[in-house]
């Protein structure tokens, strides 16, 4: 990964219809080549429907919208303004977004409805291809997370309140028609585990990782005891694989230092081949700094951690335990891996040490008053060894922006997108 390119390619993106409290940047996704970006704004209020409708009629509160940007010879431009074809108040369209590798297929999740949406692009023109519906009641969280395979033909949708325990749904596309292929539950499904809050597909769609950040088992490591629920909301991750259209669970993964309320599985990311898995635990409590430090959970104000696992054949093992190099809070609230798994971006809610800067690796100078502006850390891997290479903050970092609440990397790891859903500027466009 050429980190210097981050400095050279910094762009500042706003909605074309910026309004207070729209939460533009709540979700973000990049195409494989980094030339197409989708951004969700879950509290956008327009009553428009479909593609590039009227952006100024704010009569559908919190209906949500998605904005697609593309890189052209003249730089980044907004290509499309996308709403659901059945725009409804409070649906929070754009809660999650996922682009195929070529950027021509976009999946969009909602928070409140029982629907996810698929859009396709021909040239520069977008159209709604399908509404993906579940057979469950509303308010089960269906669509809180979506992940689409590289070719756009396999879609995973999380539903963390499904039957009270959570589920993941797999849909497949043939031509332009979508159908459900699988319904996936945790091997130890329990009430309020929130299985499906985070999920990610490998490039070929044959490996699925799912987070259950409120799972309660006291186990640690790989395939441990799933029954002893004495560590409330410690969290877990599950890996399932597809063989001839049949899905089965391959691994049950816990943190190596399972802790009460650690929320392991809050975020999750897979490499393209599915052999590297990163799991975020944004409320993990050790005081360690850096790579593979001490893992004793001593209640350090929910500093957070990320864990890297590698697969050989069908066997998983932990490769690294990663913390920020400074005192932070909420490290691991968002994560993304490059295709080769050699670049990792980790979003963080707050920097508590007073060492908060703007720009790339502090190039914009010190900003001690913006402790909760948010920050994103860049890590790189050489063979199996990880280092922190850089950190990235907004060029206009301000308190409470939540920069880093969403992150996305291009396939090669050289283009990075970071959302700041509570940034306050009234600017519009790029």
PLM regions: where:
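Conserved beta-strand/short-helix segments
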Residues: 1-430
């Amino acid at each position: 990964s050429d980190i210097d390119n981050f400095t050279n390619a910094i762009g500042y993106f706003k909605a074309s219809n910026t309004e207070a409290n729209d939460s533009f940047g709540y979700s973000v996704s990049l195409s494989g080549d980094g030339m197409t970006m989708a951004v969700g704004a879950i509290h956008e209020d327009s009553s428009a429907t479909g593609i590039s409708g009227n952006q100024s009629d704010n009569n559908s509160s919190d209906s949500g919208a998605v904005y697609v940007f593309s890189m052209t010879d003249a730089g980044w431009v907004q290509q499309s303004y996308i709403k659901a074809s059945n725009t409804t108040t409070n649906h929070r369209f754009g809660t999650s977004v996922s682009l195929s590798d070529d950027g021509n297929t976009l999946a969009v999740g909602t928070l409140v409805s029982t629907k996810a949406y698929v859009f396709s692009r021909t040239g520069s023109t977008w159209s709604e291809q399908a509404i993906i519906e579940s057979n469950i009641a509303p308010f089960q969280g269906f669509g809180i997370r979506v992940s689409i395979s590289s070719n756009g033909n396999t879609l995973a949708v999380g539903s963390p309140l499904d039957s009270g325990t959570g589920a993941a749904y797999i849909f497949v596309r043939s031509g332009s028609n979508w159908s459900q292929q699988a319904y996936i539950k945790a091997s130890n499904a329990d009430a309020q585990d929130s299985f499906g809050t985070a999920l990610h597909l490998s490039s070929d769609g044959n490996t699925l990782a799912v987070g259950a950040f409120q799972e309660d088992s006291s186990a640690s490591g790989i395939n441990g005891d799933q029954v002893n629920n004495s560590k409330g909301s410690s969290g877990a991750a599950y890996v399932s694989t597809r063989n001839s259209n049949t899905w089965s669970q391959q691994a049950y993964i816990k943190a190596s230092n399972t802790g009460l309320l650690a929320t392991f599985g809050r975020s999750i990311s897979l490499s393209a081949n599915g052999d590297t898995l990163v799991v975020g635990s944004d409320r993990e409590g050790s005081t360690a700094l850096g790579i593979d430090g001490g893992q004793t959970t001593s209640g350090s104000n929910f500093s957070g951690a990320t864990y890297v696992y590698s697969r050989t054949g069908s066997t998983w093992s932990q490769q690294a335990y990663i913390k920020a190099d400074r005192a932070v809070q909420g490290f691991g609230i968002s994560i993304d891996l490059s295709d080769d798994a050699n670049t990792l971006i980790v979003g963080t809610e707050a920097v508590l040490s007073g060492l908060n800067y703007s720009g790339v690796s502090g190039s914009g100078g010190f900003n001690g008053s913006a402790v909760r502006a948010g920050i994103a850390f860049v890590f790189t891997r050489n063979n199996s060894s990880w280092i922190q290479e850089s950190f990235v903050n907004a060029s206009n970092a301000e308190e409470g922006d939540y920069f880093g609440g969403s992150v996305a990397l291009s396939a090669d790891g050289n283009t990075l997108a970071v959302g700041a859903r509570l940034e306050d500027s009234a600017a519009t466009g790029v």
